[in-house]
Amino acid sequence: MKVLLIKDVKALGKAGEIKEVKDGYGQNFLIAKGFAKAATNEVLRKYESDKKKEAENLRFEIANLEKLKEELSKITLEISKPVGANGSLFGGVTKDEIAHALKEQSHIEIDKKSLECDTLKSLGIHEVSVKLGHAIHAKFNINIKAE
């Protein structure tokens, strides 16, 4: 019996593979537990069409992330913070503040967990990197000024 694996099965194969198994193992275990479907022509056609749709969605998502990367590379955020008598910042600029400033000034919403920087503790221009997903990284500048 041929089955299309829906989930990874230890010692048999990974999801998406077509395997030849004994009838009892296929019917009573793999199909019954939801690990596989019988590899009929209809199931295989549906699987292929779903795979094509998924690939198209992935291309669309990557194209959108590339556009976002391009937008971010042109941005310089302005953040004002109070400074002490010697010109050093009180505290610093955190990832949360950077994400909030990006949303307020550029209307781009980024999760603070995707920002790759430590707390910025000095005045001036700093470069911040962002993980957008699908191995796409973007960089933008932040200008920290004294209040």
UniProtKB/Swiss-Prot annotation:
PROSITE patterns with a match to the protein in the record: RIBOSOMAL_L9 (PS00651)
Key words of the record: Ribonucleoprotein, Ribosomal protein, RNA-binding, rRNA-binding
Gene Ontology terms: cellular component: ribonucleoprotein complex; ribosome
MF (Gene Ontology): rRNA binding; structural constituent of ribosome
Superkingdom: Bacteria
InterPro entries registered for this protein in UniProt: Ribosomal_bL9 (IPR000244), Ribosomal_bL9/RNase_H1_N (IPR009027), Ribosomal_bL9_bac/chp (IPR020594), Ribosomal_bL9_C (IPR020069), Ribosomal_bL9_C_sf (IPR036791), Ribosomal_bL9_N (IPR020070), Ribosomal_bL9_N_sf (IPR036935)
Pfam families: Ribosomal_L9_C (PF03948), Ribosomal_L9_N (PF01281)
GO BP terms: translation
Family from the record: Belongs to the bacterial ribosomal protein bL9 family.
Function, in words: Binds to the 23S rRNA.
UniProt cross-references to HAMAP family, sorted A to Z: Ribosomal_bL9
Protein known as: Large ribosomal subunit protein bL9
Taxonomic lineage from the root: Bacteria, Pseudomonadati, Campylobacterota, Epsilonproteobacteria, Campylobacterales
